[in-house]
Amino acid sequence: MPHIIANPFTLTEFLLDSLPPDQRAKVLVHPKRIKGVGYSVLKALDAWCPFRLPGFQPFPEPYLRELAAIEPHAPLLIFGIENIKDLRILRKHLRTRRIAVFTWNPVIDYQQNHKVRQLHIRQLKGLGFQVFTFDPGDAQRYGLTLTQQVYRYVEPFRQEVPPEWDIYFLGQDKHRFDMLRMLGEQWQAAGLRTRLRMVPEPGRTYPATTAVEILPQGIDYPSNIDAINRARCLLEITQANQTGLTVRCLEALFFHKKLITNNPGVRQLPFYSADRFFVLDEDEASRLPAFLQTPLPPLPTGALDPYDFAHWVQQFDWLPPA
């Protein structure tokens, strides 16, 4: 297995914890961002300086020692870290050049300028790392290496409990509130039990509605897992430019749940079934109640192996040197 430097997010931690102890020992969690004007200025100088900035310690000393301990020819996966300054500094503290970066966001996300994001990708590729994406459109447009989206097997967390909600959603706004409210109001009027929970955009106010629960802050991932177990079906609404498989889709597959989605690309998945996926604006809306009650077809043995983190990460063992 390659060494891994991973972002400090709770979902990432959930994936990493699926690794056996001997493999988990090869994982470094990247430090959270340190706030402060002085530190930010010195960090920027260190990032763009061709050598290490004398007298400046960009990350905690134990972390820097662990970076230096990675062997010169060892394969290394940088998982979900895209900050250019951090990556430029990391490169100066790593002896290996067999490095891959997996981007866990679409190239053009909902809040960034197209040209700015394109510049970011050019800088990312200019570091000399091999850049991987789960999104086929991004791979084609920007010359990135395509790989699978990733999740993990969840047997220790999956519970067979009576469903409390027919449809469950959790996510940030990302310009999806209006659609969530419309769908929620339609489904509630049809007698369906919904729980659509949304983290608001900072500074934005929202009209009152019983269809969408506006959260004061994000919830921890174990609480999300508990809600998934208590739902019959999950809802995903993808970003406008996204074509790749989402984590929400994999949550549904691994937790044995149905999925309602606005992504027609799910029809191309090897495990697509009309009894497993309901595509908004393509499948008849009147069919939704029957879809929710139809038994979920079983998946073939091993069908999800390519998306399971412990299997997925093995592809990076064979990284060529930059």
What function would you assign to each model-found segment?
Residues P21-P31, S40-W48, G128-Q130, R141-Y153, ...:
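Active-site regions of enzymes building and remodeling cell-envelope glycoconjugates
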Residues L19, Y206-P216, Y221-P320:
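Catalytic binding pocket for nucleotide-activated donors in carbohydrate/polymer assembly enzymes
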Residues M1-W104, Y110, V266, H311, ...:
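N-terminal pre-catalytic "stem/leader" segment of glycosyltransferase-like enzymes
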Residues R88-Q188:
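Catalytic core of nucleotide-activated saccharide and alditol-phosphate transferases
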